């Protein structure tokens, strides 16, 4: 009703941008007359005007004033360098991002290109801009691809990758625009706040940040905090024994009701992801282990057994993790990617290693942690892009204070979303998926099948192999993951079948008919890797091998080093055609020239990738070899385009890409992301979801209604069920899950908010010490507070002065400051409390000057080094202990809900008291350490 009265708020918002779009369009002709050098000069002029304004508010006003001109410059640069012109709707997207909102843009509408506009504008402040992506590949791709526009205009572009050293990181963070993943940014922030020297700090002050796939980062990953940890030794045999014991325990068929245990040794609650021993299970475990109490603090077992049961029941191989190089590697549930280096905490990862009979790694202790919510709230300017923001609009607004604006598509959507097909059993569903895939494939249309786990993708792969349907498999398995971009880029070819685990944030567009640009790059890599890349590097990435109907997917084991063999063996199903003799000769000459200049197998794969990517750019270059590489790339691309243009037409006529979903995800948003792969930029396309009543979502969250439906439907397993009640159950289950996980994220955020205020105080103190030129004043400040606290502890203002315990007070002062050895009670007997504090503080300052003169005689500057060392040492040690105490408090505080107390308020109050105590201990320990500091002299060492 309100919408009818006042109109759609999103439409009203979009109208506000229209006059600015017209102004940018008006400037287009004028800007197009400028030479390349003129564009660079304009950039420098704008940068000097904006960056010289130090007042934050006035600088913001300047950005608004120059926005139309800046956007017009970026549009022109993009036309010249990328041959891509920003549409009007993309200009609106850029303005929405500049205003620190979330821009919802459908798949294929050019989100990556949109980001160039606000990034360029905000980089003119000279304070740096961060573009955040979900993985290293996308960060690298965008830095190479979109970075061309910024480099062309004279701005510096940085890229942060996993294997970079601190010097490279600092250099890249100092660039005008830096591309990085969310985890690299977060971990660098934590590492910077553990640095012991200001030169080890790699990041500068945060300014403005654009997050690509913002929902993936701020919502999906918000449940898991970033943690830097150190190793703690725990007995490995306990994990192994608990794993053996878990196999002997019997799972209960149902959950306990009204406090009565079900039959069995333990119950599994999949919704809460927990395993609980029954009384019978407790007795069995105690008998097997020969102990009286599983919770005995001197010999605890309960934690190990619970983790072993969770490893057995809830952490499934090829779903939650895969085994790679004899290690259990986590698979990201949202993106389907492996996360090497990440481990589950609280001994869960060790329990999985014991279950799989792998070497058990030591447990860890948290040294530093932060949630993504609180990390990204550190940016004064935060914006994001996604294809699906409206489903999470409330959460963006409440947690991050971010508005969402839907950007209209440039062309009308022609995608058809066919109705779901629901089957009674999972077997029936997979048979139907294989059948539909085969039918659509035979029509000459490309098919993309989205699965939710590695295990399911391999099940479908074997079904399609039985049907003799050639297909590509993209999941977290290492042999498939390195072909990711190639597989997705070719997923739009006629009759192509691609099975992909969780398509969220894959980043590569599926172009109908195939991507000629990517194929050309791939062709050159196939030829050049054996000739230019070091043999030990050759497997990264190996030369792609086309999957046939019988293969299990993957790569050719070894690339031939002979050029002719590489060319003649190019699979016609991978590349659209065989290259003609003239181009083959051109490639042969290119190879000889590159080997002569770059050396025989002297490069790493990344170096070769870099050079091919540079050659694929349109930016001007003086490097003759890059020019030669560019000519060859262009020739191969044109040759492939001849075939692919015809193939694209054929695919369009057949109906475009068909997307099949094989399970409803926990979030409707991820389902929409999968659907959004079809029908990009006005293309034809269709989607359909195949579901079964045995799917996790319905089984765990559907409740009794779905269980009753299963019994009610007396149909064959391969017969689809259509029912309004079923559809409603499905939607209600999905909403239940979304609410459930939102509550978890909200709770994580609320509890971390308490830690966040403490973290800011500690990191602020640390930074002051790292940069501090006036450390002496800081330490004396600690000492003065300590003296004041000693007086408050030992002197009771309600008692007359003759009853004050002066001797104990003097003894405590001497404990801290041995240089005040001659302090006597008669010196202070007649002083008031305030005078006493002032006197002791004055004595502290005199003693500190004396200590400094002693230390400085040994080596000038040593006192300042000692101050920095002791403050950082105390902050780091006490903060680490404090984090552990806060974790323990959080676990114990939950039980107070039973006593009608709010656990969060209890956590805030007690956490605050613990924090004050930590800061007090830090100050006292620093003062004590400074006065006890006795550096070795050369004379001492000789003795």
Curated annotation (Swiss-Prot):
This is Protein translocase subunit SecA. It is an enzyme of class 7 (translocase). PROSITE patterns: SECA, SECA_MOTOR_DEAD. It comes from the Bacteria. GO terms for molecular function: ATP binding; protein-exporting ATPase activity. Keywords: ATP-binding, Cell inner membrane, Cell membrane, Cytoplasm, Membrane, Nucleotide-binding, Protein transport, Thylakoid, Translocase, Translocation, Transport. GO terms for cellular component: cell envelope Sec protein transport complex; cytosol; plasma membrane-derived thylakoid membrane. It catalyses: ATP + H2O + cellular proteinSide 1 = ADP + phosphate + cellular proteinSide 2. It is found in: Cell inner membrane; Cellular thylakoid membrane; Cytoplasm. Residues 535-564 are annotated as: Disordered. It is a peripheral membrane protein. Belongs to the SecA family. One of its GO terms (biological process) is protein import. ATP binds at residues 90, 108-112, 509. It comes from Prochlorococcus marinus (strain MIT 9215). HAMAP family: SecA. Its EC number is 7.4.2.8. Monomer and homodimer. Part of the essential Sec protein translocation apparatus which comprises SecA, SecYEG and auxiliary proteins SecDF. Other proteins may also be involved. SUPFAM superfamilies: Helical scaffold and wing domains of SecA (SSF81886), P-loop containing nucleoside triphosphate hydrolases (SSF52540), Pre-protein crosslinking domain of SecA (SSF81767). Part of the Sec protein translocase complex. Interacts with the SecYEG preprotein conducting channel. Has a central role in coupling the hydrolysis of ATP to the transfer of proteins into and across the cell membrane, serving as an ATP-driven molecular motor driving the stepwise translocation of polypeptide chains across the membrane.
């Amino acid at each position: 009703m309100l919408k009818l009265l006042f109109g759609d708020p999103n439409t009203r918002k979009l109208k506000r941008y229209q006059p600015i779009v017209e102004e940018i369009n008006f400037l287009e002709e004028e800007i197009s007359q400028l030479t390349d050098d003129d564009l660079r000069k304009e950039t420098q002029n704008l940068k000097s005007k904006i960056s010289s304004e130090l007042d934050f508010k006035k600088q913001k006003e300047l950005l608004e004033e120059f926005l139309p001109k800046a956007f017009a410059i970026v549009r022109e640069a993009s036309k010249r360098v990328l041959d891509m012109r920003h549409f009007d709707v993309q200009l609106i997207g850029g303005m929405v991002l500049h205003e620190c909102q979330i821009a919802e843009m459908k798949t294929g509408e050019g989100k990556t290109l949109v980001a160039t506009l606000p990034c360029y504008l905000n980089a003119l402040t000279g304070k740096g801009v961060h573009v955040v992506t979900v993985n290293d590949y996308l960060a690298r791709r965008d830095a190479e691809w979109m970075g061309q526009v910024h480099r062309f205009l004279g701005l510096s572009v940085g890229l942060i990758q996993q294997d970079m050293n601190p010097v490279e990181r600092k250099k890249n963070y100092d660039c005008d625009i830096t591309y990085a993943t969310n985890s690299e940014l977060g971990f660098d922030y934590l590492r910077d706040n553990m640095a012991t020297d200001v030169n080890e700090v790699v990041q500068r002050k945060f300014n403005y940040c654009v997050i690509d796939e913002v929902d993936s980062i701020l919502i999906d990953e918000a449940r898991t905090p970033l943690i830097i940890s150190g190793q703690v030794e725990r007995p490995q045999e306990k994990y192994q024994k608990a794993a053996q014991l878990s196999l002997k325990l019997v799972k209960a068929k149902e959950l306990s009701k009204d406090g009565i245990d079900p039959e069995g040794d333990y119950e599994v609650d999949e919704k809460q992801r927990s395993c609980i021993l029954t009384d019978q299970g407790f007795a069995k475990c105690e008998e097997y282990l020969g102990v009286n109490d599983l919770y005995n603090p001197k010999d605890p077992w309960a934690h190990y057994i619970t983790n072993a049961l969770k490893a057995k029941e809830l952490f499934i191989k090829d779903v939650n993790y895969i085994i790679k190089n004899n290690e259990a590697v986590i698979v990201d549930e949202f993106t389907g990617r492996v996360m090497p280096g990440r481990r589950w905490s609280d001994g869960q990862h060790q329990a999985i290693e014991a279950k799989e009979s792998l070497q058990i790694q030591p447990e860890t202790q948290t040294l530093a942690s932060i949630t993504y919510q609180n990390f990204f709230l550190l940016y004064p300017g935060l914006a994001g892009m996604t294809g699906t923001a409206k489903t999470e609009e409330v959460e963006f607004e409440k947690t991050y204070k971010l508005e969402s604006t839907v950007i209209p598509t440039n062309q009308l959507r022609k995608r058809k979303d066919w109705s779901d097909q629901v089957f009674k059993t999972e077997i029936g569903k997979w048979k139907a998926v294989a059948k539909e895939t085969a039918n659509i494939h035979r029509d000459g249309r490309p098919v993309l099948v989205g699965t939710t786990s590695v295990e399911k993708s391999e099940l479908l792969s074997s079904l399609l192999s039985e049907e003799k349907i050639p297909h590509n498999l993209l999941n977290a398995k290492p042999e498939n993951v390195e072909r990711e971009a190639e597989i997705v880029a070719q997923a739009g070819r006629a009759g192509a079948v691609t099975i992909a685990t969780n398509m969220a944030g894959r980043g590569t567009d599926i172009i109908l008919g195939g991507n000629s640009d990517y194929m050309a790059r791939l062709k050159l890599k196939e030829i050049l890797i054996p000739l230019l890349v070091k043999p030990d590097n050759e497997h990264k990435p190996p030369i792609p091998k086309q999957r046939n109907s019988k293969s299990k997917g993957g790569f050719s084991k070894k690339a031939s080093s002979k050029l002719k063999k590489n060319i003649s063996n190019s699979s016609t199903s991978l590349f659209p055609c065989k290259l003609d003799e003239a181009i083959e000769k051109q490639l042969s000459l290119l190879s000889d020239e590159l080997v002569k200049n770059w050396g025989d197998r002297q490069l790493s794969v990344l170096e070769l990738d870099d050079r091919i990517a540079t050659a694929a750019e349109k930016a001007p270059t003086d490097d003759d070899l890059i020019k030669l590489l560019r000519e060859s790339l262009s020739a191969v691309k044109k040759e492939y385009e001849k075939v692919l243009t015809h193939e694209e037409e054929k695919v369009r006529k057949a109906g475009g890409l068909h997307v099949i979903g094989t399970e409803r995800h926990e979030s409707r948003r991820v389902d929409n992301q999968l659907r959004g792969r079809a029908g990009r930029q006005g293309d034809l396309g269709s989607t359909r979801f195949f579901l079964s009543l045995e799917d996790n979502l319905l089984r765990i969250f559907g409740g009794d209604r779905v269980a009753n439906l299963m019994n009610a439907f007396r149909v064959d397993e391969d017969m689809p069920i259509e029912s309004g009640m079923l559809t409603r159950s499905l939607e209600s289950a999905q909403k239940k899950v979304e609410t459930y996980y939102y509550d978890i994220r909200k709770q994580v955020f609320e509890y971390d908010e308490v830690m966040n205020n403490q973290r800011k105080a500690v990191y602020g103190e640390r930074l002051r010490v790292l940069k501090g030129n006036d450390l002496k004043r800081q330490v004396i400040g600690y000492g003065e507070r300590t003296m004041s606290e000693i007086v408050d502890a030992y002197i009771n203002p309600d008692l007359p002065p003759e009853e004050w315990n002066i001797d104990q007070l003097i003894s405590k002062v001497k404990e801290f400051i041995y240089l005040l050895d001659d302090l006597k009670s008669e010196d202070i007997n007649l002083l008031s409390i305030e005078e006493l504090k002032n006197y002791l503080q004055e004595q502290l300052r005199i003693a500190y000057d004396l200590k400094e003169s002693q230390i400085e005689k040994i080596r000038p500057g040593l006192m300042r080094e000692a101050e920095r060392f002791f403050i950082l040492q105390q902050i780091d040690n006490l903060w680490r202990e404090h984090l552990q105490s806060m974790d323990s408090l959080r676990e114990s505080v939950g039980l107070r809900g039973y006593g009608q107390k709010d656990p969060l308020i209890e956590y805030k109050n007690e956490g605050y008291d613990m924090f004050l105590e930590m800061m007090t201990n830090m100050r006292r320990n620093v003062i004590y350490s400074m006065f006890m500091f006795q550096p070795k002299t050369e004379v001492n060492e000789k003795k």
